[in-house]
Amino acid sequence: MSKTEITAEPGIPMIIITREFDAPRELVFRAHTDPDLLVQWLGPRDLALTVDQYEVRNGGAWHYVNTDAEGNTYGFHGVFHGDPSPDAIVQTFEFEGAPGHVCLQSTTLAGRGGKTLMRSVSSFQSVEDRDAMVASGMERGVHDSGERLAELLARLQAS
């Protein structure tokens, strides 16, 4: 598996994202938890990411903003739950353009002989919230993020 797979089963308030990366899980974990690396891969290619806060610890808050070419901003925030590790990065996720529609994301990283299988499960409060996320065009950002992360991991391993 080298492409990002997105699964959103009808009637279930959940989105599952999986992708295998050609990099060790510790490096994939670092890319998920180091804000200097996060800005290099998270989100659509045509948006700039600014990380305002990223406290990777139990109860730690995070906040980042995507900015498009016209200067429009799209803010997101949440809180980490438990101590983030390659076994589980658990956090809430809320788009500031639709307050009150919080989802819980759990990302696991499984090492596979120098490669890493990433599995991210987003659980929504309702099927309607999940459907609104799917309808928002999130697939483009998810696919771009997967490609950009693979490119970043290749650069980090080459240096």
Language model segments and positions:
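A conserved amphipathic terminal alpha-helix motif
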Residues: 125-159
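Short, solvent-exposed aromatic-acidic interface loops
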Residues: 69, 94-99, 121-128
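A short, structured loop/turn motif at beta-sheet edges
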Residues: 25-26, 56-57, 81-87, 108-117
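Hydrophobic ligand-binding cavity/cleft-lining segments
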Residues: 1-48
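Intrinsic-disorder/low-complexity, polar/charged segments enriched in Ser/Thr/Lys/Arg/Asp/Glu/Gln
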Residues: 12-18, 49, 61, 75, ...
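Short beta-strand segments that buttress and anchor functional surface loops
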Residues: 62-67, 90-96
